[in-house]
């Protein structure tokens, strides 16, 4: 049923739960497993080149760490996890990569927000679900 699975990994608790589900599904369906981590860019408050460089260094270290942990977790279950870090807007980048990679399934974690926040900003998981070219599993 699923031959190629993509999991979104931002290092959050929701993403960790999504990774566990994605690993189990990859085992069950003997599917290839990929992860995408999105670096959303330099904060607007970064005023100097030094601050920008420090932010990028910290982001690089963070993504190396979470992806190393994800690869190790998958390996324990006998699954090879291919990781990618991409700069961009979270929703657009994940949806584009899902289309580009011809994935059968996208697994994402859910982060709860207040009703007001959801109305004003929309929900990342909701927007990904609307725009995704493939089946989406949202893990709570």
Write out the residue ranges for each language-model feature.
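Small/aliphatic-rich secondary-structure junction motif
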Residues: 3-49, 73-75
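Conserved beta-strand positions in the Rossmann-like core of class I SAM-dependent methyltransferases
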Residues: 34, 82, 137
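Short secondary-structure boundary segments
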Residues: 38, 109-111, 140
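Short, hinge-like loop/turn segments at secondary-structure boundaries
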Residues: 50-54, 100-102, 124-126
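A short acidic, glycine-rich active-site loop
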Residues: 52-65
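Structural beta-alpha unit
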Residues: 72-106
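Glycine-rich, Arg-bearing micro-motifs that act as flexible, cationic patches
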Residues: 105-130
């Amino acid at each position: 049923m699923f031959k190629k699975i993509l999991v979104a990994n931002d290092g959050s608790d929701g993403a960790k739960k999504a990774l566990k589900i994605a690993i189990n599904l990859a085992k069950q369906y003997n599917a290839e497993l990929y992860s995408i981590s999105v670096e959303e860019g330099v904060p607007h408050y970064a005023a100097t080149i030094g601050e920008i460089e420090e932010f990028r260094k910290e982001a690089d270290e963070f993504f190396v760490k979470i992806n190393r942990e994800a690869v190790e977790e998958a390996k324990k279950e006998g699954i090879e996890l291919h990781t990618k870090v991409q700069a961009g807007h979270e929703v657009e980048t994940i949806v584009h990569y899902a289309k580009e990679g011809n994935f059968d399934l996208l697994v994402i974690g859910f982060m709860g927000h207040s009703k007001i926040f959801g109305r004003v900003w929309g929900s990342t998981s909701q927007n990904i679900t609307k725009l995704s070219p493939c089946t989406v599993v949202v893990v709570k």
